């Protein structure tokens, strides 16, 4: 698979790095590790929102060489701290993220998949935390989906499963899997190690801004690696054909 983004000795003050790695088209990459590991800092750097030491190549060009307008066409980014910019109907907010604003059926499909059908006429400042999270997810999906944006290459998500119930998490997994099959590269942070074990193709395990392990999910999420990252003992079990991680006392 082609390399979409390449990081070389990326670092930010004392919070991150230096670390290196590759993001590949058609793969879901999970960033895992304890709080303060540097996951959010790394995602913001990969999104082009911050700068620091080291280099990042995006689609063969230095990330800092991309204009904001061009970057928005090729990558989408959802941070944890996003709040509604000002009051507007949800459908209007979602339309602002579409490069092809005539694709109303696509907007309705994505909204329906994330159970937002009945929220489209509501104002963005009247949403619960979970509803706003789903609106944010719908917005970045509409921004980057190859169905309407052939230039879309990379989707960056900071803890996208926050505030979602089990059904909504499953719906998002289906959307991300479909985007991945269309060739998009997806990088997301996660605190659910078993979710990573089921849904990620590859993982980067971080602690204190350093990369402890990277590679296929099964190679990274091993009890020794996790013990080093979290300071706790883990076991990996096979239950009805599915691998599962549990803490041991």
From Swiss-Prot:
Transmembrane segments: none
Enzyme category, top tier: translocase
Alphabetized Pfam families for the sequence: ABC_tran
CDD domains: ABC_Iron-Siderophores_B12_Hemin (cd03214)
PROSITE patterns on file: ABC_TRANSPORTER_1, ABC_TRANSPORTER_2
E.C. code: 7.6.2.8
Molecular function GO terms recorded: ABC-type vitamin B12 transporter activity; ATP binding; ATP hydrolysis activity
Record bears the keyword Lyase: no
Entry membrane topology: Peripheral membrane protein
Domain of life: Bacteria
A cellular component annotation (GO) from this entry: plasma membrane
PANTHER family the UniProt entry points to: METAL TRANSPORT SYSTEM ATP-BINDING PROTEIN TM_0124-RELATED, VITAMIN B12 IMPORT ATP-BINDING PROTEIN BTUD
Quaternary structure annotation from Swiss-Prot or TrEMBL: The complex is composed of two ATP-binding proteins (BtuD), two transmembrane proteins (BtuC) and a solute-binding protein (BtuF).
Family indicated by similarity: Belongs to the ABC transporter superfamily. Vitamin B12 importer (TC 3.A.1.13.1) family.
UniProt protein name: Vitamin B12 import ATP-binding protein BtuD
Source species: Shigella boydii serotype 4 (strain Sb227)
